[in-house]
């Protein structure tokens, strides 16, 4: 089985997240994408973070009709902060050695990868897939520690969309840089719209929008602007 791991705060999960998951699954030939909501993201301030159980439930509702998308509560049920190394080890035990893990991560987050807990070990446990992010260039990877030398012209070709992916040796699993269509949807923008009472304009799955309104999420402090 080829399993994509998509972690995040999903605060809230939105149509952009779903599009990224489906596009990555198709581009990489994955059997399934596993959404992994974080309980306490170690690299983000709590700010306007909704309760973990609410964020989990919103993801569950969002993917309910798509069997190619699944959800794990591995980080929700674990006490303390959510570190990727712990999550990957637990998922390896759960799914077994026959499952190949693909760690999907945005370019913005991957630039901080050397500061993560046990980054070198992570590179031995799963294959990293770095996804394009609006406003960021893949050629910035040329200065990231721990990475193999990737030819800058190839990174520039990826930025210019002359190619759609690059594969490079990294750890025992390898690295994939994948250019996806840009998404204009932002969780922080959605939270702002909710606080201001603005319509969602098809930014959220209907079930998620209903859940937010029913449980009065993201409305407690209309002056808060944390992203």
Residue ranges of each PLM-predicted region?
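Nucleotidyltransferase catalytic core that binds NTPs
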Residues: 1-227
């Amino acid at each position: 089985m080829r399993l994509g791991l998509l972690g995040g705060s999903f605060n809230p999960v939105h149509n952009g997240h779903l599009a990224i998951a489906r596009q990555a699954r198709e581009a990489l030939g994955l059997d399934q994408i596993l959404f992994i909501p974080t309980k306490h993201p170690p690299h983000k301030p709590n700010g306007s973070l909704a309760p973990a159980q609410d964020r989990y439930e919103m993801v569950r509702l969002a993917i309910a009709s798509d069997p190619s998308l699944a959800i794990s509560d591995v980080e929700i049920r674990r006490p303390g902060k959510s570190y990727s190394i712990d999550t990957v080890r637990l998922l390896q035990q759960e799914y077994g050695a026959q499952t190949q893990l693909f760690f999907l991560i945005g370019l913005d987050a991957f630039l901080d990868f050397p500061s993560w807990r046990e980054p070198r070990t992570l590179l031995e446990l799963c294959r990293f897939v770095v996804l394009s992010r609006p406003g960021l260039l893949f050629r910035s990877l040329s200065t990231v520690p721990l990475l193999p030398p990737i030819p800058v012209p190839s990174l520039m070709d990826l930025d210019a969309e002359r190619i759609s992916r690059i594969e490079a040796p990294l750890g025992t699993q390898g690295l994939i840089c994948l250019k996806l269509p840009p998404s204009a949807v932002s969780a922080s923008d959605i939270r702002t719209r909710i606080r201001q009472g603005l319509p969602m304009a098809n930014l959220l799955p209907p079930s998620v929008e209903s859940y937010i309104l029913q449980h009065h999420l993201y409305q407690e402090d209309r002056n808060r602007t944390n992203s």
